[in-house]
Amino acid sequence: MKRISKWRGAVAATVVGVALAGGTVSAQSGGLQDWGFDPSVLAADGRDLLQRAPDPAVDGLFQAVHASAQDPADAGVMCALFDPAADRSLEGLNKTAARLGEASRLRFADAAVNVFVAAAQSPPQPFDRAQATQWLKAAGVRASLLHDGFVAGLNGGDHAARCDAVEALLDVLADRPVAERAAVTRLLLGEGLAYVAGDGAGAMPLR
């Protein structure tokens, strides 16, 4: 479904950005160091962590994104990543994360710590990429049925409408089972980390 896949890069960048926010806040508070983790490992070895983190821990990152989307100020910060020319380099994501409110950053910090700790204590988790992709597409279909203007907002040039569409997609995913939400989050986070692990320059390509 092109109307969904076109913005997967932006949503993936948002998930990575809030995860980095959690790592940054935890680093400042000593949280991750207390557990023996270096926050920079999220970008360097994040895919290994992602493979090992159980569904509830991965879902915690989704819940952090969804909760922040309910706050107008933080939603505006995250929505900036949806613009086609947004800077989704590692530096750009860090700058975006730093602009989030304290409550959101602390929420992401808790989610990030849970991912690091759970991944360190768990074996690799099963993951069906094709199934996760289908669940993401199905969420897009549900959002288009429930929210007038969803497709036009997702594909159009209006910033506010695009943000509303992505938030509608998050709302639909929030009502799905944990395993489904975690699979979609794992898919998007994996795509975002794959980009960050590359040259990190400029905007993440939109597919």
Give the ranges of each region predicted by the language model.
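Bacterial N-terminal signal peptides that target proteins for export
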Residues: 2-12
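A cross-kingdom marker for long, charged
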Residues: 157-207
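Generic structural signal for hydrophobic core residues of well-folded globular domains
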Residues: 53, 65, 69, 85, ...
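N-terminal leader/presequence regions that precede the main folded/catalytic core
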Residues: 3, 17, 26-31
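N-terminal Sec/ER secretory leader and immediately downstream segment
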Residues: 27-116
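Sequence contexts marking disulfide-bonded cysteines in secreted/extracellular proteins
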Residues: 78-80, 140, 162-164
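Extended amphipathic alpha-helical interaction segments
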Residues: 90-157
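Bacterial N-terminal signal peptides
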Residues: 12-21
